[in-house]
From Swiss-Prot:
Chemical reaction(s) catalysed: DNA(n) + a 2'-deoxyribonucleoside 5'-triphosphate = DNA(n+1) + diphosphate
Protein name: DNA polymerase IV
Top EC group: transferase
General function of this protein: Poorly processive, error-prone DNA polymerase involved in untargeted mutagenesis. Copies undamaged DNA at stalled replication forks, which arise in vivo from mismatched or misaligned primer ends. These misaligned primers can be extended by PolIV. Exhibits no 3'-5' exonuclease (proofreading) activity. May be involved in translesional synthesis, in conjunction with the beta clamp from PolIII.
Site (Substrate discrimination) residue list: 15
Active site (catalytic residues): 106
Lineage, opening ranks: Bacteria, Bacillati, Bacillota, Bacilli, Bacillales
GO cellular component: cytosol
Description of how the protein assembles with itself and partners: Monomer.
Record's cofactor remark: Binds 2 magnesium ions per subunit.
Family (UniProt): Belongs to the DNA polymerase type-Y family.
Length: 356
């Protein structure tokens, strides 16, 4: 039986990082994102600089203002966060259809079928993090392990912008030294109850037998017993079947130079072709999307009689679509190429070079 390989990707202080990206003056500042009303609002995300003052998510804004009176308070822009999240989820699904989103900024990916002797899971995780940064200019942390529980635990161990692998050779040591409050799923109330029963670390939890944990914590006790041993049989539950594969890029400055834009379309066509090959799919529609300097999004699609998957075929159609869309007087800030109406293609063995 093939050993499972699960990645948990968690964006670093997601909402705050988006705000810093869109307003560079906020970089390095204590940024608190949340509700507009100071007296009723709640903190959605705090940058690491704000966390140094004790500010954290789900904290009332009134308390955040007391802890960090000179912080930079930004009203949440959920439409923007959803758009960026969509870009990130599209990247995940370009690697595997087994993606289980947990929120706008985190997901589990089962990449067992992609792992090869020359392509370890950690390398794939770094390629995903690279792609996220190229598309969104945001950093993500990743955890890699043989089950979901350990992958999630690992993703939080080397933040921000880090990668941690938990495997059979280090899992016991990591779990035994872990503060009980750092176990995924153990909140303040659970931590307090565990302290009442002298459970402060993973080692303390490990030393309790299963029947005692069930007596103390009910049905949840069995899960705690398993967590102390790094056991988790839960599968990654794919939320939907992928219908398209695409890639998009935001230019560092607004562009209306055809040569620059067409080079980028060629690059995106190649990336899209690579991802189609990785999942052994081809498609019968091609879409080009443009976002103008005024943040207006326009797109054009072409349906095909026969499915395609090569860089040349994708580029030739994308080139035509771009020429139909472009306005020489209007600079653009983003360009995207997507292939849809996917169907199974011929099998292609993967190597590390398919991901570079």
């Amino acid at each position: 039986m093939t050993e499972r390989r699960i990645i948990h990707i968690d964006m670093d202080y997601f909402f705050a990082q988006v705000e810093m990206r869109d307003n560079p003056k906020l970089k390095g500042k204590p940024v608190i994102v949340g509700g507009k009303a100071i007296h009723r609002g709640v903190v959605s995300t705090a940058s690491y600089e704000a966390r140094a003052y004790g500010v954290h998510s789900a904290m009332p804004m009134t308390q955040a203002h007391k802890l960090c009176p000179n912080g930079y308070y930004v009203t949440s822009r959920f439409d923007t966060y959803r758009e960026v999240s969509g870009q990130i989820m599209k990247i995940f699904r370009s690697y595997t259809e087994l993606v289980e989103p947990m929120s706008l900024d985190e997901a589990y990916l089962d990449i067992t079928h992609l792992v090869r002797p020359d392509l370890p899971a950690s390398t794939i995780a770094n390629y995903i993090r690279r792609d996220i940064y190229e598309v969104t200019r945001l950093t993500a942390s990743a955890g890699v392990s043989y089950n979901k529980f350990l992958a999630k635990l690992a993703s939080g161990m080397n933040k921000p912008n880090g990668l941690t692998v938990i495997d059979y050779n280090n899992v016991h040591e990591i779990l035994m030294q872990l503060d009980i409050g750092d176990f995924p799923g153990v909140g303040k109330a659970s931590k307090k109850k565990m302290h009442q029963h002298h459970i402060y670390t993973g080692q303390d939890l490990y030393n309790k037998d299963e029947f005692e944990l069930i007596r103390l914590f009910g049905k949840r006790g069995r899960g705690l017993y398993n967590k102390a041993r790094g056991i988790d049989h839960n599968e990654v539950k794919a939320s939907r079947v992928r219908k398209s594969v695409g890639t998009e890029r935001t230019f560092s400055t607004d562009v209306n130079d055809d040569d620059v834009i067409l080079r980028k379309i060629r690059e995106l066509s190649g990336k899209t072709a690579e991802r189609l090959n990785k999942i052994q799919k081809s498609g019968k529609t091609v879409t080009v999307k443009i976002k103008t300097y005024q943040y207006e999004t326009i797109s054009k699609q072409k349906s095909l009689r026969d499915p395609i998957r090569t860089e040349t075929d994708i580029y030739n159609i994308a080139y035509t679509l771009y020429n139909d869309l472009k306005d020489p007087e209007i600079p653009i800030r983003l360009i995207g190429v997507t292939v849809g109406s996917l169907e199974q293609s011929d099998f292609k063995n993967l190597t590390i070079y398919d991901f570079i």
